[in-house]
């Protein structure tokens, strides 16, 4: 295998697609250090509410480990369920206004273990073309008939639903916020079509929960769809503290069946008590105040408006993801490298992560960013943008 992998790795490197991991030597926050001892402002983390280093969550994690131990050494159905796990599942269900919730090691596992457990070859899954890789992989593991519609294209979705009418069940699967463009799925229209064609609706809230909606409660709040979305999946690794862990929440019968049949749930260790305890505390914090969400919204609006005024081409967004369009792959790499020299940590994305000719810098805003952080990033964008001929 070595003889095969070595030239393939060389090809990846030659194509400029090799992924190098930058080493961070501080906690995850707005201002970080990366090796070799470089101070940068972080604009590429999923730390939307700025909770990754929150002292209250660290204290809660420490206390949970003191009372409930470091790890579970078991899957849930043997001896891996503590009272903390049930408390967190109840908090998730309460947050999303659903019947029940089930925890996974990651949202990748939640999506990977969803469809196979519920659907057969008599059923159909209709999936948005820009859905996350975990949904794509989950669909591949399932025997249901597969349909795909162009991103947020309701005409194509309706055509797929018409084609799938002979199937027993139809499930529409979509991200709430699409991670590369930052656009919010048109959930109101999706739910209308689901009702018209008798389909279930599943939405991955990984980039939308904690972010979109009047108080950050996600797409159901944004579009007033409580009771009309059947299945939510999501992560504890982004807005909700940034540690790890995923979940599925929805109707009781669906969650009960996942506990019986979902393979990543049945055959993976339970989430560690420290993460569970901190996550419970995080949901308490979000119940007490909307201040973090309000600050995030202010930061997004300020950054987007200033960047557009400077002449940058910004994808429309209602999320914390701001796509600065550069279109050329090499330009996106050069731009990101120059930004790091200016003390701003951003990432360039290009084919095959995004379509050819759609290269961009993806900026992720956080409630952890202060106004001076935003101003420094905007000034760096303008300086580098002028140097590289992106703006006048």
Task: Annotate each language-model stretch with its function.
Residues 294-303, 308-343, 353, 357-358, ...:
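Conserved PLP-binding catalytic core of the aspartate aminotransferase-like
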Residues 114-133, 154:
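Conserved PLP-anchoring active-site segment centered on the Schiff-base-forming lysine
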Residues 197-200, 207, 212-318, 331:
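Active-site C-terminal subdomain of aminotransferase-like
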Residues 75-81, 89-113:
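Short loop-beta-helix segment that forms the pyridoxal 5′-phosphate
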Residues 47, 147, 151-203:
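Active-site phosphate-binding strand-loop segment of PLP-dependent enzymes
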